[in-house]
A protein has these predicted regions:
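Glycine-rich phosphate-binding P-loop
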Residues: 6-22
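ATP-dependent small-molecule kinase phosphotransfer cores
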Residues: 40-112
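Pre-Walker A (Motif I) flank of P-loop NTPase domains
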Residues: 1-9, 111
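Short, amphipathic alpha-helical "lid/cap" segments that border enzyme active or binding sites
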Residues: 101, 202-210
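ATP-dependent NMP and nucleoside kinases share a basic, alpha-helical "lid"
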Residues: 99-155
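Small-molecule kinase domains that catalyze NTP-dependent phosphoryl transfer to phosphate-bearing small molecules
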Residues: 57-66, 74-78, 158-202
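Short beta-strand-centered segment that lines the nucleotide-binding/catalytic pocket of NTP-utilizing
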Residues: 29-40
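Strand-loop microenvironment adjacent to phosphate/nucleotide-handling motifs in alpha/beta enzyme folds
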Residues: 90, 135-137, 145-147, 179, ...
Length: 216
């Protein structure tokens, strides 16, 4: 049985829901937003800052300067990011990525689990404490029309805005992944399976993944 299942996903493909069901089927923990909380606790970065910027910025000093203005303390011009001195030396994007990477490794070392997003497939592959043979990397995608409908239903958006948001979020996810892993997001060479969640629906897709994890 595969002990660690990573779920990379396009926005609107149902990856979070699928990952949650997989975890229940296997009787193991499911981690998504928990990664943000742990990363914030260990790094000193504010949880809201991590959540807002985890896929919005790329590595480099320019983005540190750019974001610094947005998070300056009013009337002082000084940065206030809720971070400790140990993290403040690195570019903000690197701080966010490193904090989440460390959180993913900490959670995985506790035992078998399902992890959604945040380059977890790449992080676990390069973690010496985790055997690569125990990892199942899944990429969930869906047709654009289905993802747009998902955004309309869950976010209450009009069709045009929903399509724009779907494309923008997927672009951000791709840029983030490509920047920090030097891989190509969604490239089949980096995953064990690429699954169109629209074919079977979320629940059946999740049960299929769980069965594969049990038998592989």
């Amino acid at each position: 049985m595969k002990k660690y299942i990573t779920i990379s996903r396009e926005y609107g493909s149902g990856g979070h829901t699928i990952g949650s069901i997989v975890a229940k089927e296997l009787g193991i923990p499911f981690y998504d937003n928990e990664i943000i909380d742990l990363a914030a606790k260990d790094s000193g970065l504010h949880p809201d800052f991590i959540k807002k910027n985890e896929q919005n910025i790329s590595s480099g000093w320019f983005y540190t300067l750019l974001l610094g203005a947005s998070y300056a303390t009013p009337g002082t011009g000084s940065m206030h990011l809720g971070m400790n001195s140990a993290t403040s030396a690195a570019p903000l994007a690197d701080q966010v990525f490193n904090a989440q990477r460390n959180a993913i490794i900490q959670l995985a070392k506790k035992g078998p689990c399902v992890i959604v997003g945040r380059c977890s497939d790449y992080v676990l592959r390069h973690c010496e404490e985790i055997d690569r043979k125990d990892i199942l990397n899944i990429f969930i995608y869906a047709p654009l029309a289905d993802k747009v409908q998902y955004a309309i239903k869950t976010k209450g958006l009009d069709p045009a805005t929903a399509e724009r948001d779907v494309k923008l979020i997927d672009k951000r996810r791709a840029n983030h992944y490509n920047t920090f892993t030097e891989r190509t997001w969604g490239n089949r060479a980096h995953y064990d399976m690429l699954i169109n969640s629209s074919l079977l629906g979320m629940e059946k897709t999740a049960k299929m993944i769980a069965q594969i994890a049990k038998e592989s």
